[in-house]
UniProtKB/Swiss-Prot annotation:
Keywords: Apoptosis, Hydrolase, Nucleus, Protease, Repeat, Serine protease. It holds the Pfam family Trypsin_2. Belongs to the peptidase S1C family. Residues 84-274 are annotated as: Serine protease. This is Pro-apoptotic serine protease NMA111. Residues 307-379, 845-958 form the PDZ domain. It is found in: Nucleus. Its EC number is 3.4.21.-. It comes from Pyricularia oryzae (strain 70-15 / ATCC MYA-4617 / FGSC 8958) (Rice blast fungus). GO terms for cellular component: nucleus. The gene is NMA111.
Length: 1029
């Protein structure tokens, strides 16, 4: 069913190797691929134990979670469990090493009076957090972060103790001094807030280096404890307690290779942070931008540790077997050119040092001051003075969102991971105008509009001065490959995302405060430009070669996902059908709806805006338009043939491949057939139905998503289009079919548009498929009709059967409409043996039909429905989900509409994602009140106070009713209404609802929304070398 698809926060580490403690920067991935360490590794946050079902939960229950076997342990556990809470949380947007996600974890109360809860830093996250805690008696309370450590894996949440009414709240004492090798411990955690998990183990190590989890957040410059406890998903942040009921460590991670090894964070630094909070003191954190590792004496000897120093260290610390060794020194940091990799640390401020805990103490107490380090380098003593920096100053606490992307200063975490200087502008959400290639993050900006952007302040000033709709050059590097400078051109969107917003962390409220930095500058008026076209060589038909002047490159960018469409950006080649009016025909797999920006490139030189003029409801093409006055180029109008192309006919194929290069060849039409594009069951989206498809005898046809079939005289006989199909369950990629569409079917529509008339098509609300005469005879078609079919269509002896009815609003079941299984014989006395003959329906309100139903021949008067009402013209964004009327693809696949409020998409890290409201759900009630349409739904949800629970009654696509309770969050996910309005420059206008009041325009708060379409598509639509060709 539609339960939450949250990820349980339990960090896992890969199997052991000889590189057990080496950071991944020392290993280079092959062919620039994403680094996968052969040693310690963990999936990114949004890959933790996704979508656990009942079997998964049972498997977790069967882990060795043995209960206490003594009276002492029973008493201890009974006392501890009341302090442990289950944390359900959202990291509401991508920030630093954390992706936007919804997850569950554990924490425990460490100050009952003030309401402090200790958990992991990878739970609290470095960015915006929104969550709540569930206590052992299932009382719930909101929680917000008051501290997250810049480096170590702990954070502190705050809650209101007065909100817990039905149980006493007690704190679990922190006793880091009681952690010893051989101590028996219990890891007490909550699994999904429902099942108590008590796992037993024995501490086996106190001196393990912090595990490396690969790309993403990792702890460092601390030791970890090790035990065998087999902790499971959701156990991050669990207290590790001894038999006396004291917390001796914090559960932080474990192995992912099946071993039951778990890693615990020592509590020395969490205890200090807690005491600072209790005393109202700042939590100072010092660092010299050098990562140390614990290395045993034998390895230190190989690095040059002198025997006399080893003797002195062993005498001073008889139980120690390790020393601190410099592993990574960041360029341009305090340690740069002073400390070198492989240096063995002996003293800090004349004090012998062997432990991370004491090193942290000294650095945290000397922020802004110099410290003296005594190092052994190749057997020689080296003494250096290093300035201690402020860790908080190199940990981002703000981000800027503009033009659909998000940016902040490069963090110490990222800099340490890749061994680079801790400076630069990091793209934490590479979306909107700043979508670079196929990776969503990891980019460091170098220049924008030929201006350097070394820091966030400079970035803000540069972007402020770029007008809306400008195209500017951007250079950038990826942290995994700083040797390569990438250059691209971006289209700056400051109309869909008009505000430049600064979000700053507020540790007093636990929220991130939003501020408007600048309004968008108006776009610069376009000016006419000249261009010429390439010459198509090696063709014997000059008229065919001239057709390159009829092709234009089209990029369609969608600010919001509607109608189940899986992408935010598509590109393809369009065919100019009227150069004087600037009309272009293109596949609806490229331009799916009109809430979009369209850029048209002519002659690989002139870039102009386009707009949607017409979207065909069935035949997979759209007609868009540009302003021809801006184009001074010999654009040629393609001549569309009025005669149907036939099977076996010779033709010329001109197509554009995946990188936008033209290819051409002489070929033959192999087949013309009524195509049945498979429906996408996971999330219905536009697909072509009731249309003939053409295939040709050339391998080039499968490589090209755009093109034409041309007669020798240059007449276009068919368009070559991309048809969006189903999603492959094995690869999670969207299937695309490349097929031809004969041009005669376009001519009536094109003629009306050329005359300035908006086509008002009508259609039969059914989907047909062809059947052969053997099937038709069995189903009751008479021999007389079969004979007429053989005479009417000598190339294909076929009739058409209704396979699916499209659900129409207010349609009477007994109105004479077609039913599944009906065989169509005639329409308006015309025998129908070709799919193109169905085009008669586009211009008639009623059609006289002869059909065969259940072996009986019937005459019907078939009503057609208006096709101009099938496109989405109204949408609502609420709690991170997109709602609109069920679009045509939904009605094609469903037999009953439960309401006019349909969930089309949702955003990761949002309330809709956390509480399990999934795409393809229908909303029928809000707090028990019927919401049959968007108007009543919007009125109901805007009346709900912020941060309060409400009930949604939903029905799944498979007709299963269920109820979801959600909590409203307007701060990060405001309610916005999108209304199609031709008077607006963009064709749509927005209404934002804040505190139940409506106001025009974009919301002043809210994180950048990156919608996830059902099924989790793999975005394989790689743009060309530049965003705009």
């Amino acid at each position: 069913m539609n339960g939450p698809t949250s990820q349980r926060a339990k960090r896992k580490q890969g199997s052991a190797s000889s590189l057990d403690d080496r950071p991944p920067k020392h290993q280079r991935a092959l062919n620039g691929a994403k680094q996968q360490s052969t040693g310690d590794n963990t999936p990114e946050e949004d890959m933790y134990d996704q979508g656990l079902d009942d079997e998964d939960l049972l498997a977790q229950a069967l882990l060795p979670s043995v209960g206490p076997d003594t009276v002492e342990w029973q008493a201890t556990i009974q006392k501890v469990v009341s302090n442990v809470v289950s944390i359900r949380f959202c990291q509401t947007c991508s920030f630093d090493t954390d992706a936007a996600l919804t997850s569950e974890a554990t924490g425990f109360v460490v100050d009952a009076e003030r309401g402090y809860i200790l958990t992991n830093r990878h739970v609290v996250g470095s960015g915006p957090f929104w969550g709540y805690c569930i206590f052992d008696n299932h009382e719930e309370v909101d929680a917000y972060p008051v501290y997250r450590d810049p480096v170590h894996d702990f954070g502190i949440l705050k809650f209101d103790p007065k909100a817990i009414k039905y149980m006493p709240v007690a704190a679990l004492p922190l006793r880091p001094d009681l952690a010893k090798v051989g101590v028996e411990i219990r890891v007490v955690g909550n699994d999904a807030g429902e099942k108590l998990s008590i796992l037993s183990g024995v501490i086996s190590r106190l001196d393990r280096n912090a595990p490396e989890y690969g790309e993403g957040y990792s702890d460092f410059n601390t030791c970890y404890y090790q035990a065998s406890a087999a902790a499971s998903g959701g156990s991050s942040g669990s207290p590790v307690v001894n038999i006396d009921g004291f917390a001796v460590a914090l559960q932080a991670g474990g192995r992912a290779d099946g071993a039951s090894t778990d890693y615990f964070l020592p509590l020395d630094r969490p205890l200090r942070a807690l005491q600072c909070l209790q005393q109202g003191k700042p939590i100072t954190r010092g660092d010299i931008q050098c990562q140390f590792l614990l290395k045993p004496f034998d390895e230190c000897r190989r690095l040059g540790l002198a025997p006399e120093w080893e003797a002195q260290m062993r005498k001073a610390f008889p139980k120690e077997t390790n020393l601190l060794v410099a592993e990574i020194i960041l360029p341009e940091g305090p340690s740069s050119n002073k400390v070198e990799e492989g240096d063995v640390l002996l003293k800090v401020n004349e004090e012998l040092i062997t432990e991370f805990i004491r090193l942290d103490d000294i650095l945290d107490s000397n922020v802004g001051k110099p410290v003296k380090l005594l190092l052994q380098r190749g057997g020689e003593d080296v003494e250096v003075e290093v300035d201690v920096g402020d860790l908080h100053s190199i940990t981002p606490d703000r981000f800027v969102s503009v033009a659909g992307g998000s940016f902040h200063s490069l963090s110490y975490q990222q800099a340490r991971l890749y061994g680079v200087a801790c400076k630069g502008v990091y793209v934490c959400e590479a979306t909107g105008s700043f979508r670079f290639e196929t990776s969503d993050n990891g980019w460091i900006l170098q220049t924008i509009d030929n201006k350097k952007v070394p820091d966030l302040e400079t970035f803000i000033q540069v972007v402020k001065n770029i007008p809306d709709k400008a195209r500017v050059v951007v250079t950038y590097k990826h942290l995994r490959d700083l040797h390569t400078l990438n250059t691209t051109i971006i289209y700056v969107d400051r109309h869909w995302s008009s505000k430049m917003k600064l979000a700053v962390r507020n540790d007093d409220t636990g929220l991130w405060d939003f501020t408007d930095l600048a309004d968008a500058l108006p776009p610069v008026p376009p000016v006419p430009r000249k261009a010429s076209f390439i010459q198509l060589e090696h063709t014997s038909h000059p008229a065919v070669a001239e057709l390159v002047r009829s092709f234009v490159h089209v990029t369609c960018t969608m600010p919001m996902k509607l109608d189940g469409f899986p992408k935010n950006r598509k590109w393809g080649m369009g065919l100019v059908i009227d150069a004087e009016k600037g009309l272009v025909v293109i596949s609806r797999a490229i331009v799916p709806y009109d809430l979009c920006d369209i850029s048209i490139t002519i002659g690989e030189s002139i870039v102009v805006e386009g707009k949607v003029v017409f979207l065909h409801p069935l035949q997979n093409y759209a007609i868009i338009q540009y302003d021809p006055k801006l184009v001074d180029a010999p654009v040629q109008s393609a001549k569309l043939s009025s005669e149907e192309i036939t099977q076996g006919a010779s033709t010329y194929f001109i197509g554009y491949n995946r990188i936008g290069r033209v290819v051409h060849t002489a070929t033959t039409v192999t087949e013309i057939f009524a195509v049945a594009i498979p429906a996408n069951s996971g999330a219905p989206r536009y697909r072509a139905v009731n249309v003939d498809a053409i295939t040709v005898d050339t391998n080039l046809s499968g490589q090209c998503g755009s093109g034409v079939l041309v007669a020798p005289d240059g007449t276009v006989q068919a368009l070559w289009l991309t048809y969006l199909g189903e999603r492959s369950p094995s690869t999670h990629r969207d299937e695309e079919y490349h097929l031809g569409l004969a041009t005669p079917t376009l001519l009536p529509v094109v003629k009306q548009i050329q005359q300035g008339i908006v086509p008002k098509l009508r259609m039969l609300s059914v989907e047909f498929r062809s059947i052969q005469m053997a099937q038709a005879r069995i189903m009751g078609v008479s021999e007389e009709w079969i004979q007429q079919v053989s005479l009417a269509n000598t190339s294909h002896h076929q009739l058409f059967m209704v396979t699916k009815r499209t659900f129409e609003r207010d349609q009477d079941e007994n109105s004479g409409a077609l039913l599944e299984g009906d065989i169509l014989l005639t329409l308006n006395d015309k025998l129908i043996t070709r799919i193109s003959e169905l085009d008669i329906m586009y211009s008639h309100e009623f059609l006289g039909a002869v059909i065969v139903r259940e072996t009986k021949e019937l005459k019907l008067k078939l009503p057609t429905v208006a096709a101009d009402d099938v496109e989405t013209d109204h949408a609502v964004s609420f709690c991170g989900a997109i709602f609109h009327r069920p679009h045509q693809a939904v009605r094609q696949q469903i037999s009953k509409l439960y309401s006019e409020v349909y969930v089309s998409a949702r955003t990761r890290g949002s309330p809709s994602y956390q509480y399990g409201l999934a795409p393809t759900n229908f909303i029928t009630h809000v707090n028990g009140k019927r919401t049959p349409d968007l108007k009543t739904f919007l009125a109901a949800v805007t009346a709900i106070p912020d941060n309060t629970y409400f009930r949604l009654k939903a029905v799944t696509f498979d007709s299963v009713p269920w109820v979801v309770t959600m909590k409203k969050n307007e701060h990060y996910f405001p309610t916005v209404e999108w209304i199609k309005d031709s008077s607006e420059d963009c064709g749509w206008r927005r209404v934002t609802y804040e505190g139940g009041k409506a106001m025009e325009g974009e919301p002043s708060e809210g994180v950048p929304a990156v919608e996830e379409e059902a099924g989790g598509a793999v975005d394989d639509d790689v743009p060309m070398a530049a965003v705009e060709k």
